[in-house]
């Protein structure tokens, strides 16, 4: 939003300079992007009149003029501008004048004719880039008046960034309101008295889309002179706001747009067939716009139409057929309130961005239309003449926005600002903002003004009070809070400790999306029900994950595709499982999962290449589980998981409760996911492990330990873990260590059986064990194994 500082000061004129004004606007939340003078630095340029204008005797493109600047004599000035003519009021740089670029005017001869000055164009005075001709001033411009004073060139253009919530500041009136509030200054609105209708002409207006267009005002103005020149003061204001003058009718609608922030449109009334209809477009309907382009419309686009065709896209762009041209005599002025949702996105769909769409998308004051159409009518009649009919009002109060009533509590205000503002100041600020305020016990009820449709909740009022009070007036206060010592349970095992261990073992932590591809998830968890997102980022991210494996395996594939074949990664995060017993029907479990693949070690000249296997991952996992103090209660049991190899996987149990899985990815899944080589995964429900068993200190025996090795033959389907567990149970007082150190199948062992070599470490804390005691304990272990598993000692 760009505007003239002097135009703003016509509405409100605080006793501060330009820099202070710009800083104040910025601190109020409307960031000033730039302040620039409207003209270059010059002096000695005055208003003059061309009294005589004759052809230069020695040059075809030059003219010899006599110019009256209000002095004792006429000045002889040679001019080359094509629009120079007798009777024209012009800007004259007299001898001694200094123009932008330090260009000094001196008496000279041009092709033999004396020249005592220069007739200036806008570009020569640094006002604009227009160098097509000299400046043409109004006929009533007083001779000899300094041009800076006459055109009010001691002015600045101020450009601000208007945030989407402050659409009310997309007009001079909105910025002026804020400046008036900040300075406690009166707002001086220009006179906008209603225009008395001098004709009774109207036009039938029908609003079919009442939700999209709650209010539509129209007014017929007949007998205008569309070719009447736009006054220089209006052209200058438009120029300083970055708007090029086109013709009087368009200039008037642009002027009120900039002044009040309300878009308008003018139709050639004689080219409207039957009347105006505000409706939704028909699918595939076309309209030729004012720029000559053809737009093909969708059924959700609001259009202004007559009884046979669309005349334009509502709130965005008018149509060529009903546009005002040089032959127009009768116009229909349109001023409407369109629901922002009916305009949003439609302009971009057709590659358009107009001042009107910019404002309508953000919202305009629903109570501003009457004031705007009266203002535009008066300006149009003053410039183009003609007669105005009555205002045609088609409004639907039920669909117009309602003013919000908001309660502001003293406790909320003080808590969010961190500073106490006196009650009377709060009330005064709210009233200056345009709110209707009712004061209560430690609270205020405020009805937001129609132009502040961004005021909806209590926090909005807190923001407004702080903004107007001045952020710089809120003192810095150190935060005061009691120091509360956090409780620490020795039994709590932090994930940070687990992550550190995995890092030490060469794993890298990754974070993957909770949104996964439902097709991939079905491959990993066939038949499992997942939560599907109603509005996903993409189809490939439309399901909530049932485990962390989806993201981890995708990460492995990503790395393998980039020649990273040795991968060790882990992740902690939530899985989302549909569960009717859980809150909102979703159970969220904190999981710890990891993946390894590739070589066991980094490439080294002294190490043979060995691919990781089940026991590499199991060993790493046991190290993690050992941190919990529950490793002794952990069992790995053969159990089917559709994502894992049936012969190289296991379920992980904590006592009798399953808490996870470990194993090699199923070859079929490996193929479908494009994994390169054997890949191993694990996953644990971390919440079931986080409460660790605190280690108990115990005496270290001073007596020697004894090792005895036994080899027992058992059926192939007997888990080695059960054998070890049974040995520990039998020798609970004296067996301090049990370890499986060899598994043998082959000669001497019947098919379907295996030989397990087990070491038993026996030790007592009070005495040295006798050989008889050791032998008896070993015999008890062998007997227990024989009884439970039909084990036999291998010869």
UniProtKB/Swiss-Prot annotation:
Cellular component per GO, a single term: phenylalanine-tRNA ligase complex
Gene Ontology molecular function terms on file: ATP binding; magnesium ion binding; phenylalanine-tRNA ligase activity; tRNA binding
Source organism, top-level taxon: Bacteria
Domain tRNA-binding: 39-148
EC number from the UniProt entry: 6.1.1.20
Entry's cofactor comment: Binds 2 magnesium ions per tetramer.
Domain B5: 401-476
Top EC group: ligase
Family: Belongs to the phenylalanyl-tRNA synthetase beta subunit family. Type 1 subfamily.
Name of this chain's protein: Phenylalanine--tRNA ligase beta subunit
Localization, UniProt: Cytoplasm
Keywords from the UniProt entry: Aminoacyl-tRNA synthetase, ATP-binding, Cytoplasm, Ligase, Magnesium, Metal-binding, Nucleotide-binding, Protein biosynthesis, RNA-binding, tRNA-binding
A Pfam family annotated for this UniProt entry: B5
TM region(s), chain numbering: none
Binding site for Mg(2+): 454, 460, 463-464
Segments forming domain FDX-ACB: 701-794
Cofactor: Mg(2+)
SMART domains in the record: B3_4, B5, FDX-ACB
Catalytic activity: tRNA(Phe) + L-phenylalanine + ATP = L-phenylalanyl-tRNA(Phe) + AMP + diphosphate + H(+)
Statement: the UniProt record of this protein carries the keyword Metal-binding: yes
Subunit structure: Tetramer of two alpha and two beta subunits.
GO biological-process terms attached to the record: phenylalanyl-tRNA aminoacylation
Source species of the chain: Salmonella typhi
